[in-house]
């Protein structure tokens, strides 16, 4: 334990670390602890921690020690009675055990920030430990050459220096159930004697024995006694005894009181920075060797010690405070905190829960379930008990309790108002989902006495506890079938607690075990109802169910779901990777909004006694409504191996259900209540109900426009006698429990493939809860149209089904379970995340990704968008937030703390939905007629990342076909200057289709290649970049099609479009904007108009009649079309300079007249006052109504790819008004861009195979010398080919694609693609040749790291 004798100056970062706030309540405010904490929570939570200085003195030292010894003695006696062991010293005083904690740095450890903790094996009385602690402190300071009295900052400096010095150990007695405060009965008596205020802190409501269940704390309604949560724990420490970075269980508040001794330093990080904090720990603490989920679990072991300096440098808000004896420290939900003691001291702590905790309770429960930790509490149970208790209160006019202060009542009313609002919102959400899922059928109520149904067993709890074999601190499970789970005290968790004690809210409990403080939670209604329900106790005594998707304990309503036979067969045999994409794209939040959009008037009732079928959409149908026709084909089942690697591949599936498919499936019934069945199994389409009547139901009814669940249509059972027929494959028909929200999501996913069997269950007191919610809603003036829900009692068959579902929870299914196939099994994903396969990246699960702040791999871009031009040197700085008393700017904080652009996220999701291909059951994608597969997958994804796209666009309709009058001569194709004139041709049939890379036709001699952004026309010599992927390389199935509906649809210049409104919207947004301005700026000379029909089909007539809104939208979309080539990564060509010269000549002739007339023309065009002849209209990608008043002469127009230039700020403006000023500004920007293009094209590389050009001769010379001319790079290459490939480093070009079916990953380099393919194939080619090792590795980096760390031989490397 060598200690450096150098000067112990305070670290600068410690001096600058913000100090957490301290609050000094008045005596009146101090009477209601929860109300006061709720009052300061908004301010203090931005620090994560705060300090409260009581207005009353602490208890005397003698009293505190006496109470502590009494608690320790009682605990020892209880252990002796339970057959354990108790320890007392020879004088008869109680003793306690301690743990050894490492101080110092051990570089040999894999992760040095994880400090070892182990049992010391010593037993001390309070006096003995105090003597040893003070002796250690004296000796340590003497070796440091420091005086005995040090400031807090000096001690902190000593501590952090010791953490990086030679290791030594200290002792700490923590997590000991007990309290040093006087018993509650004695405290109440003394309070009465003193007039209700108390003489010391222990005689007030701040007595730690009662804080968890204080008035206003939600934990008041927990029936279990969990040490450290609902009852306090004691901590006895010595100098440098530390507690590691952690958050409280379920993100609860914690209250900590220091009784006596030296001070204690606390460090805190606010909840807003929690995810960023975890990422810094993962990167800087764990060396990026753990994925985020395992990082969170490892932090939960409470062994990670890291200096706040690391977090401050990484942009994480962090603060500190020093707790002195007699002071309280409050930590707020989700705030990470750690600290250490300055010397010998002892204190105690427990959890509380203010109403603000309810806002984050669900997310905390999901994160806890994601690491397979069993839940300790149901936030919904506490919420319901809390609100119903408020309803049964005695009116204040006859309340014998004195009103202490208006502040107390005001703070309490704020908390009550918040809980009531959350309560009503939750019941409304349930009401909508019950109505949409149940279709009006009675919902089963769980029995009041459910001893015959074992809802939770010890096996289930034990299987959820995690054991970490690497650490001496671990959770031990003696026997999965035993009655208790033994928890090693060294793990920093709670004491040895029986499962039935700790999780009694999950299991059946005695109905007579009620605390007197909770008696008012039982009734809120009349005395008659109270007598009627005298057998039932508070709502907390009812059993709880855990959702398989999110892990949250559903206290009120659950759904038991089983896929139907058809859906199960599909799930077991087909590649279902697109389900994950569907979930990632839609999100669960949309379902609630969708449910609220439903109309309850169309609901029909089902059979009341059995599971009922959900109306499904079969795949064999062809429905025609009016002039609208939609059709789909029956899927072909494709077989695929169901293994872990297949699941990994499914995480990268690139197809999802698009809006187009949803709209096609939306069918209007011919008459109210009358629908037609299209049976997938080949039946006559009718199902017979129990009463013998024939009931038709609509198989086509899909979602509403918001993807909601339809309430219309009838459904009845075919298999009434046995609704769940046993199948040979248990995994395919396994019953699972879902919360209502995720049950609705699963129903929506499986609806097209056969549907589900569904049983809805509610708490036996749910009708009473819903009745109370309606009263509270009126009180809060919340208007809602409640759906009427009928309830029924469960039958014996229902109880057997419930028991089977709960048994399936305990039986851990493999990767063939249908919920695993569907990607909605949270427990399986949590287990999978701990496998070596996912050591650095979590397996995709939408719930887990959202809980840990990760974006969906479907929507996330593989590389960051490049900001080029002059804007790259200037980073816009803005205020991100205020934490720890400081305003944080965007350049100061960790990237995880930067606010996400909600509009950008929505547009990205919309873009993903529109770009994603439709996929049938065979795994093949069906492409729109005018979009090639390659262009959509590559360009669409890139375009989504760089531009915000409107969710809706102007429908594009097929116009009259045109015939080329004057072709392009050979001369014009050389200088790329041409003139085209078109005339209407209604008598000539023309072909618009061609297989391959080019598309041409008699009427369309120019076509935009969506993949490359190059104009293809007759006589035009095509060229392409070396970095681009050819369509032919991906197979002959990829075709480029023009967007004509049919050849015969052109006749007579008028037609009915074969596209409905929504199809055209999709086609527009899927079009790559690849047409240069020279072809888009045409004068329309042949008058055409669109007339909207009620059925959504547009008809053409002979006069322009277009609304201002449509015109403005078209002009805005033209802005997007102009800049597409800028964003495609397509920069230089071999003939850049020639085209630039021609463009400059043309510009001098036309720019002035265009400026004078463009604004006036657009205004007249938008108002419908002016008709112009059509010069051309091409149905290729990105064609828009762009008007030029004066047509330039022959030779003035040209096609020229745009340069990757600066991004104009108006790129995302699709709906702004096109005024004269806007048009003039656009012309000025065009001139600036052309100047840059000319500069860029001034110096062309003439080396063979190189098409790059530069703006200066210096850059060109460096380039020819095989030196990268990019500023700050300057790399040298021995081959010009490698230099050209190196340019990918400085651009967004990712030409290489993963060949695995369903994977959307793209790469810049071949080696990275090769390594990625191993993820799909499971290949592990690197094998350690060391005897008795034989480890295999997928990546060479992992293999090299293994050899460095182990020293194994590198000479015998094998590849297999």
From Swiss-Prot:
Region annotation Disordered: where it falls in the sequence: 652-698, 955-1012, 1044-1081, 1133-1155, 1172-1238
Motif (Nuclear localization signal): 944-951
BP terms from Gene Ontology: abscisic acid catabolic process; abscisic acid-activated signaling pathway; epigenetic regulation of gene expression; ethylene-activated signaling pathway; heat acclimation; leaf development; positive regulation of gene expression; positive regulation of lateral root development
UniProt: Fe cation binding residues: 246, 248, 337
Tissue specificity statement from the Swiss-Prot or TrEMBL entry: Highly expressed in the shoot apical meristem and primary and secondary root tips, and lower expression in cotyledons, leaves and root axis along vascular tissues. Detected in inflorescences, stems and siliques. Present in seeds.
GO CC field: Ino80 complex; nucleus
Domain notes for this protein: The 4 C2H2-type zinc fingers are required for DNA-binding, but dispensable for the H3K27me3/2 demethylase activity.
UniProt similarity note: Belongs to the JHDM3 histone demethylase family.
Function of the protein: Histone demethylase that demethylates 'Lys-27' (H3K27me) of histone H3, thus acting as a positive regulator of gene expression. Demethylates both tri- (H3K27me3) and di-methylated (H3K27me2) H3K27me. Also demethylates H3K4me3/2 and H3K36me3/2 in an in vitro assay. Involved in the transcriptional regulation of hundreds of genes regulating developmental patterning and responses to various stimuli. Binds DNA via its four zinc fingers in a sequence-specific manner, 5'-CTCTG(C/T)T(C/T)-3' (5'-CTCTGYTY-3'), with a preference for hypo-methylated status (e.g.
Protein's UniProt name: Lysine-specific demethylase REF6
Source organism of the structure: Arabidopsis thaliana (Mouse-ear cress)
Gene behind this protein: REF6
